[in-house]
Amino acid sequence: MSLPGLELSQTSSEREFVPAPPTQITLSKGSEWRFEVAFGTAIRVKLLAGTAELFGTELAASQTYTFSGTKAAIYTWHGCTLEVSAGDTISTIDGLGPAGLNGEGARGYGAGGCQSEYTAEETPMVEYANVHFALEAMRQEAKATGKDGPRVLILGPENAGKTSVAKILTAYATKVGRQPIVVNLDPAEGMLSVPGTLTATAFRTMMNVEEGWGSSPMSGPSAVPVKLPLVYFYPLQNPLEAEGAVYRPIVSRLALSVTGRMAEDEDTRETGIIVDTPGILSAGKPGSLEIINHIVTEFAITTILVIGSERLYSTMMKNYDNKPTSSASAAASDERITVVKLSKSGGCVDRDAAFMKSVRESQIRTYFFGNPIPSTASAALSMSASSTTNVTLSPHAQQLDYDSLAVYNYTIASSDEDEDEYDPSQFGTSDTFLPKGSNDAEGPEAKHAEETSFASSVPGLGGSSGEDAASGSSAVPLKKVPPPAPNTLANSLLAVTHAAPNASPAEIRDASIMGFLYVADVDSEKGKIRVLAPIGGRVPPRAIVWGKKWPGEVVGLVG
């Protein structure tokens, strides 16, 4: 409709973003198609002819896969033809596309609206496949002799493709009927969980092409079988904070759980484990080699894969190659560590802070609300009558009395963090100005937190008794957050542990996680907080750890 004389008109459908027509991409034998898609936009990929795989998981022919907010590559061993088209705009955490209502500003000029896409002839996939075959030979030997399967540690700098290699090796193992345990030690992004967690998962079935590792259990149907992760909370940005004093005990507890699972499950024992690590451990910073040694010892690593760093490879060769493992059976079987250097894929790209922030927000949103991306592939696998499907979850909102909760927080100040935090809700409630400056909040619980040592809570530490002795006098930096509820609690995550509310700080630190709450609002005057929970009913009376420092504030998850 035009306004006479002014030549102004309302926005018409012709002015909105018009997707480009589908594009066919033909890949020759041994090549791959690399693509980047922004958050808020989506592309659709269909395999028309031949065979292809994404990080080791095969694509089904004539099924449409939807990708959003990803940097990935589709590889073909024998050649294939792909059809790429533009998908629907996906709402981001603030409810809009990344560049407005339509999201057209985030669409690129590549096929289907990719920000970047090209075909590469040189790939390291043959190297990665050879690693799989070598591991498979070790698994066959383990089955024949009764030994444990290979325990693989993947090291490399940031953006070197460590997680991609872990996915490829896991997908290839499940394809031949193996059941590997995959361990994620990178708190920067979660595996089948939210950021700030360390997880271990036994993979018995295929992974989800569109969602990476797949999905954890939910109250609804799933086209691909869900995975059951064991989750520990590490609400700090990297393992080197507090000189690894918090990270190492959690790794030890996770390793103990993995070892127990392997002792009870013959299939996982023969297959072994695959450990993915954060890139900061390969940056040569003080304390990183000590943490690597701790991981190698606790998980009794037999194979170390080094990607994209000659310096790190040289160090690992010097420290570990052909050295005995820490496994209990190493002395009897003469089990030794092997260090292998792998090429970094040319498709590895830098993921800036803005992209990683979007990744974290997407993982948190998916945990509470499900996957907003409509998938025709999932619809076909589930035999749904609709042409597309997406998993929509409905979290339960409820108000809680903060006084009834036992909320704990790690009192570790980062080097770039201002320790003087302003929180008006705390004024007028502290008795610091009373005679002698007494404070009931720092009573027996706080004193107990200061007196508890690491030595009482780290079971099964192999070959690191000297390190424990050195840290035995250190206190667990975990302190209870007294009422009233601080305003900074809003828009953050709370991890509900399996520990009792009055458990020691060491027990809370080492406890696995039941689930997570999202704090939508804080009413300090009434002493209540409004939270989102994945299930209904009252919150279990357990110790709760505040993810204040990591993953930090998540604004806009709810209105």
From Swiss-Prot:
This is mRNA cleavage and polyadenylation factor clp1. Residues 415-483 are annotated as: Disordered. The keyword rRNA-binding does not apply. ATP binds at residues 32, 71, 159-164. Keywords: ATP-binding, mRNA processing, Nucleotide-binding, Nucleus. Residues 466-479 have a biased composition (Low complexity). Component of a pre-mRNA cleavage factor complex. Interacts directly with PCF11. The lineage of its organism: Eukaryota, Fungi, Dikarya, Ascomycota, Pezizomycotina. One of its GO terms (cellular component) is mRNA cleavage factor complex. Required for endonucleolytic cleavage during polyadenylation-dependent pre-mRNA 3'-end formation. Belongs to the Clp1 family. Clp1 subfamily. Pfam families: Clp1, CLP1_N, CLP1_P. One of its GO terms (biological process) is tRNA splicing, via endonucleolytic cleavage and ligation. The keyword Phosphoprotein does not apply. One of its GO terms (molecular function) is polynucleotide 5'-hydroxyl-kinase activity. InterPro entries: Clp1, Clp1/Grc3, Clp1_C, Clp1_C_sf, Clp1_N, Clp1_N_sf, CLP1_P, P-loop_NTPase. It is found in: Nucleus.
